[in-house]
Amino acid sequence: MSELWTEKYRPTTLSGIVGQSDFVLDAEHWVVNRNMPNVILYGVAGTGKTAAAISLVNDLLGEDKQGNFFEINASDDRKLETVRTKIKEIASTKRLGEAPFKIILLDEMDGMTKDAQNALKRVMERYADNCRFVITCNDRHKIILPLQSRASNYAFNRIESGLMLDILSDILAKEGVKRYTESELERFITYLSGDLRRGINELQASSSSNRSLDNQINRSLQ
């Protein structure tokens, strides 16, 4: 089975993050200084929030990532008990190697209950010297205000059409796919509304099935 293009071309360092310059500029300073605040990355799906979070971790922790970085899908582990046990244990135990702190990525945080979020606020405060949190969500309004105020908040914008055209064209070139015209790609990008991840997935589906991009769009809309 061929590798998913979204995984194959997922950026792993901050230099590969596109369209989110405010976050990248600040994150590069955090890497240099080996320090960072708690962070909330919010915005529509497919704009690179999780990839940006992991890229920050890779650049900041480097070889010390193992044993100091933990990723939790907060939509799946959304209960109060998750915070009281799993997250608290990670945040409170000793960091390894030369890492300045542990980093916990809470992905899809807008699925976590309000009680669990309030418990997380207390963990965040108590273990501030030992742990940082990176939170991603689509809807920031589902994050309680006390958590928002304890983090630097970054809006992840929809990927601009011109930038998306460059990225998708580059992927097609690397995959040796030459059958799409620029006008086809431009129509396809208009349909995506800035969701780069969906664009890469749909492009791979179209190229592997020999469907035209127009047919791929129509099929997806059914």
Outline where the language-model segments fall.
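Short, polar/flexible loop-turn hinges at active-site or ligand-entry regions and domain interfaces
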Residues: 175-179
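P-loop/Walker A NTP-binding region and its immediately flanking N-terminal helices
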Residues: 1-163, 169, 173, 183-190, ...
